[in-house]
């Protein structure tokens, strides 16, 4: 299904034939905005039913006003939201009555952070089989949602899916060496911690993520 959907996307790019009846891929500018809104609304519904809820997003920018408003709504409903946004973020986290359940972290290190990851609890505890996990080419910006061709791809391979949930996201959460926390004032504060954990070093040295395993000889910064 994913390969067939991808073929339709490339046909769209080369011959302007609109994709029809896509099975797995969600693409911009056709449906990604509505899809993201629906995914956030689903987490709101789970929270209101006292079921596990949560959103984890890794991207380069969060700018779209309507999506930001929907994330505020989710926060007020009790959805815990972790945003790893390397660049510009127009959302204000940790504002009482608005975004108390939202944490925004910028990790500035060796990697340029072009990978985008979208994880939704989907009524299950974090790292459970219920979680919806996607990789994407798109940031949460108007140009990515409304004017460019972008894709959101569900992770069906259990190995890769597990790596995202049990290694990549936890490493981003625990990173202190290269992390800056966005405050409600719009200022970034450098995180300080005795452990000084570096997610980028972890990605390069972890056997299942780097391809090098224990063969890595050099200490990364």
Question: What are these regions, as identified by a protein language model?
Answer:
Residues 1-3, 16-22, 28-221:
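PLD/PLD-like phosphodiesterase catalytic module centered on the HKD motif
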């Amino acid at each position: 299904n994913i390969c067939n959907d991808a073929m339709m996307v490339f046909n769209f790019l080369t011959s302007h034939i609109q994709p029809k009846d896509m099975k797995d891929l969600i693409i911009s500018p056709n449906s990604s905005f509505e899809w993201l809104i629906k995914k956030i609304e689903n987490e709101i519904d789970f929270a209101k039913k006292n079921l596990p809820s949560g959103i984890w997003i890794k991207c380069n920018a969060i700018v779209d006003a309507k999506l930001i408003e929907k994330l505020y709504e989710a926060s007020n409903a009790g959805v815990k939201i972790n945003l790893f946004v390397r660049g510009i973020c127009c959302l204000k986290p940790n504002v009482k009555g608005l975004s108390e359940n939202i944490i925004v972290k910028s990790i500035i290190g060796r990697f340029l952070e072009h990978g985008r990851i979208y994880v939704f609890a989907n009524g299950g505890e974090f790292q459970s089989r219920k979680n919806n996990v996607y990789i994407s080419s798109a940031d949460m910006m108007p140009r990515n949602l409304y004017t460019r061709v972008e894709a959101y791809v569900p992770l069906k391979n259990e190995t890769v899916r597990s790596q995202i949930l049990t290694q990549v996201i936890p490493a981003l959460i625990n990173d202190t060496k290269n992390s800056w926390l966005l405050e409600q004032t719009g200022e970034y504060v450098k995180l300080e911690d005795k452990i000084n954990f570096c997610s980028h070093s972890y990605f390069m040295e972890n056997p299942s993520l780097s391809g090098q395993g224990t063969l890595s000889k050099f200490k990364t910064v």
